[in-house]
């Protein structure tokens, strides 16, 4: 198994004990932890932005969200991946396969996982493999 880049929705589920998918995400990570997990600037910023919104079901202050994420990423099983691919690079992204704005971040994160030789773990069932050159089913893990 290869390292899994966790989508923002998976980070939220893992790091929010009140999240509806917390147990499912936790059980998955327990099974997969030996392969490692990754975050990047997009997923880290997205986690903090969403969980600190007043409308989020269990909001926390920004400082607490950052602290929670820092604790989670301080483990040996975590890697930080720099955002090293571009959505504009036609060698990476098949633009015609981006069907809507809600797919943009998922496709980008899948492309980053492919570039890193890893997997993209998400709850989002609408990420099209065909939008990323070289992406195969083993690169995308829908929890």
Task: Describe the residue ranges of each PLM region.
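Short, hinge-like loop/turn segments at secondary-structure boundaries
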Residues: 55-57, 99, 138-141
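Charged phosphate-binding loop/patch that engages nucleotide di/tri-phosphates or the phosphate backbone
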Residues: 115, 119-143
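Alpha-helix capping/helix-boundary segments
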Residues: 10, 43, 86, 126-128
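Active-site neighborhoods of divalent-metal-dependent phosphate/nucleic-acid chemistry enzymes
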Residues: 75-125
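Conserved beta-strand segments of alpha/beta enzyme cores
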Residues: 36, 77-79, 138-139
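Short, well-structured N-terminal submotif of metal-dependent ribonuclease cores
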Residues: 1-39, 51-67, 132-135
